[in-house]
Amino acid sequence: MANPILKLGLPKGSLEDPTIDLFDRAGWKVRKHPRNYFPDINDPEITARLCRVQEIPLYIQDGVLDLGLTGKDWVKETKADVVVVSDLIYSKVSNKPARWVLAVADDSPYQKPEDLAGKRIATELMGVCTEYFKERNIPVNINYSWGATEAKVVEGLADAIVEVTETETSIRAHDLRVIDEVLVTNTVLIANAAAMQDPEKRRKIEQIDLLLQGALRAESLVCLKMNAPAAKLDAVLALLPSLNSPTVAPLQNGEWLSLETVVSTGIVRDLIPQLREAGAEGILEYALNKVI
């Protein structure tokens, strides 16, 4: 009996290329077509389609898709009844969560949310924004923004905006100032509840989740391999962190040992000179595709 086909929703737009790259590192080659939104994927158990992140949660809820990647913000905004399989911390700019912030003109008198009572707010995240001001008992006029939200204040179309940002670069470029954080968000892998009850679909969902998580984890790690004299082993080992402990194996020359370990990319540039000074030789550094 043929395995069920999993219907996968991939985000279109700013997350599109980072997501396709992540799937590539996880083992799935996704090839886009210039004239449609149905990319090929090198797995007969999966059919993929590109969708707007705003639409994916409801497509998952309604069973149009079995599995998809979207923002935690859009799951909250749509109130979609979906299973959050895992958090996947990656984005178009960094591997950090993004923030929806309340921002005003840099030269405006507004210093806190309460100062905006009776004012006009522009945002794409209408539901979350409405809840934010309602919880604080601040009466405001919230208008939907169809894009270029940062420009609304500059153009005099709004007194403040609620917009998503990773680095605040665009916020500052429009002479805006953040006065509060509305929501922290990141990419999530979400599934249809019925699909999670189907054994074959669940198996495939868990496989995808495992390998995507492994690919993300590998981004911040590298493998180091080196040789060291047995007499200097302790000095070299003292410098080596690892997920568990370094692998040590004897070489044919009994006076030398081979060592292998996984370390954070952030310490490599300092670690390699220290290892060399401690007596290690033939030091190799190589990237990892997945760490499970």
Go through the PLM ranges and name each one.
Residues 2-45, 50, 70-86, 90-99, ...:
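Small-molecule-sensing regulatory modules
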Residues 47-66:
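Short, structured active-site "lid" loops
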Residues 58, 101-103:
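Signature of uroporphyrinogen-III synthase
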